[in-house]
C-alpha cells in the first residue's frame, strides 16, 4: 500500500508548502519506506509515500519522472504483468533505468496514452502530469481495489488516496451530500462517484479522467 496525492493551482498561484507537507504527513502511514514531494513548478506538486514491493532500490522512489522530466507519475499498487509490457516496450526501443513497475507504467503511458490501461493487469491508482500540455491523467483499476479521490474548484485541483487528506488541506470546502448519507443508511454504500462531500469525487473502478 502506498499513498499518492497532488495539488495544482488552476490560476498559477504558489502552493503553500505547509499544506503540501501536511498532505504528505497524512499519507505516510500508507508508505513507511519513503515519502517525498516533487514541486513540478511553484503551482504544481505531486506527493508520494512508498511501501516498497518491487525494485526496493531508491531509484524507484516516487514521484518518478522520465529522463526529460516532461512526465511525472505517482502510483499506488502493483502491475502483475509489468515484465511483459516492459519487453514489449523494449522491442520498440524504449530504454529502462529501473527494475520496477512504476517506470514501466509511466513509459507505457508515454507510448500508448490511455490505451495502456487495456494492457494492465493488476491493482492500481495513479496520476501522471504532462508538463508540456499542463494536463493530469488519473486512472484506477477495474475492480477498484486502490482508492483515488479528487476535487476541483476555481482555484485548485487536488487528488489523493484518502478523502481526509483532501478535506484536511482546507483547499476544498466541506459541503455535506445528504443524498449520499441517506443512500448509505439504506444500502451501506455511497453511490457512484460520490463521497459524502459534494465537492469531492472518487475515480470509479476502471475509469480514467483527464484534467487540462
Feature-to-residue mapping (PLM):
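Cysteine-centered catalytic environments shared across enzyme families
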Residues: 1-212
Amino acid at each position: 500500500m502506498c499513498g499518492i496525492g497532488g495539488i495544482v493551482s488552476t490560476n498559477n498561484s504558489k502552493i503553500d508548502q505547509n499544506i503540501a507537507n501536511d498532505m504528505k504527513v497524512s499519507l505516510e502511514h500508507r508508505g513507511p519506506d519513503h515519502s517525498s514531494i516533487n514541486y513540478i513548478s511553484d503551482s504544481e506538486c505531486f506527493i508520494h509515500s512508498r511501501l516498497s514491493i518491487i525494485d526496493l532500490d531508491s531509484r524507484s522512489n516516487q514521484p518518478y519522472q522520465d529522463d526529460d522530466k516532461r512526465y511525472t507519475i505517482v502510483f499506488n499498487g502493483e502491475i502483475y504483468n509489468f515484465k511483459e509490457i516492459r519487453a514489449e516496450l523494449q522491442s520498440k526501443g524504449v530504454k529502462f533505468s529501473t527494475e520496477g513497475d512504476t517506470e514501466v507504467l509511466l513509459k507505457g503511458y508515454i507510448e500508448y496514452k490511455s490505451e495502456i490501461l487495456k494492457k494492465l493487469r493488476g491493482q492500481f491508482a495513479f496520476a501522471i502530469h504532462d508538463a508540456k500540455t499542463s494536463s493530469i491523467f488519473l486512472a484506477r483499476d477495474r475492480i477498484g481495489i486502490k482508492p483515488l479521490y479528487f476535487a476541483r474548484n476555481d482555484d485548485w485541483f487536488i487528488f489523493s488516496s484518502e478523502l481526509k487528506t483532501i478535506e484536511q488541506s482546507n483547499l476544498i470546502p466541506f459541503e455535506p451530500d445528504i443524498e449520499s448519507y441517506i443512500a448509505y443508511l439504506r444500502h451501506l454504500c455511497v453511490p457512484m462517484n460520490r463521497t459524502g462531500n459534494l465537492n469531492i469525487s472518487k475515480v470509479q473502478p476502471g475509469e480514467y479522467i483527464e484534467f487540462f
